């Protein structure tokens, strides 16, 4: 099954992949060559550290290539869901107790980053929001107990 991903999320992954291939991979290859020049490889900590870093970089490159090849990239600016919450929606919620507003965008699992306000489509919050409309209330089971929010606005921004 293909994993949904926003075009912006796919672009971020492509940029990371390009950086790893064009900058990090050559750096670590040079570091390995430099460490080899120091002689005995058995007790050469620089060599072993560089090889470990190379392994990490190559693993991340393979992971990113796989994620991108299995992604279903969705251009959310072309969605016409109106005020209904679907994948890609940017939702502003107001806590009904504190009136504190929070803004989240519902994205694919691979691009989720709560610090940036990006929540995974599979998260409990996103699952509770899908299908709701502006003005609807939603109850979320949070670690600190149940919280009730009102959907203040729904937008489809890139």
Swiss-Prot record:
Coiled coil: 45-73
Any single Pfam family the record assigns to this protein: GreA_GreB_N
GO BP field: DNA-templated transcription elongation; regulation of DNA-templated transcription elongation
Domain of life: Bacteria
GO MF annotations, alphabetized: DNA binding; RNA polymerase binding
Record InterPro entries: GreA/GreB_C_sf, TF_GreA/GreB_CS, Tscrpt_elong_fac_GreA, Tscrpt_elong_fac_GreA/B, Tscrpt_elong_fac_GreA/B_C, Tscrpt_elong_fac_GreA/B_fam, Tscrpt_elong_fac_GreA/B_N, Tscrpt_elong_fac_GreA/B_N_sf
Keywords associated with the record: Coiled coil, DNA-binding, Transcription, Transcription regulation
Function: Necessary for efficient RNA polymerase transcription elongation past template-encoded arresting sites. The arresting sites in DNA have the property of trapping a certain fraction of elongating RNA polymerases that pass through, resulting in locked ternary complexes. Cleavage of the nascent transcript by cleavage factors such as GreA or GreB allows the resumption of elongation from the new 3'terminus. GreA releases sequences of 2 to 3 nucleotides.
Family statement drawn from the similarity comment of this UniProt entry: Belongs to the GreA/GreB family.
Protein name according to UniProt: Transcription elongation factor GreA
UniProt organism field: Xanthomonas axonopodis pv. citri (strain 306)
């Amino acid at each position: 099954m293909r994993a949904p991903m926003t075009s912006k999320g796919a672009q971020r992954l492509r940029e990371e992949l390009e950086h790893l291939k064009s900058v990090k991979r050559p750096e670590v290859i040079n570091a390995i060559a430099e460490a080899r020049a120091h002689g005995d490889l058995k007790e050469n900590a620089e060599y072993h550290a560089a090889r470990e870093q190379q392994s990490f970089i190559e693993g991340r490159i393979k992971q990113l290539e796989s994620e991108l090849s299995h992604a279903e990239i969705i251009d959310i600016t072309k969605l016409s869901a109106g005020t209904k919450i679907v994948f890609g929606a940017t939702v502003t919620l107001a806590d009904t107790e504190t009136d504190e507003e929070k803004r989240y965008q519902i994205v694919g699992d691979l691009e989720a980053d709560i610090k940036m306000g990006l929540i995974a489509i599979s998260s409990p919050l996103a699952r509770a929001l899908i299908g709701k409309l502006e003005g609807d209330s939603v109850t979320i089971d949070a670690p600190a107990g149940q919280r009730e929010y009102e959907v203040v606005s729904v937008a489809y921004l890139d």
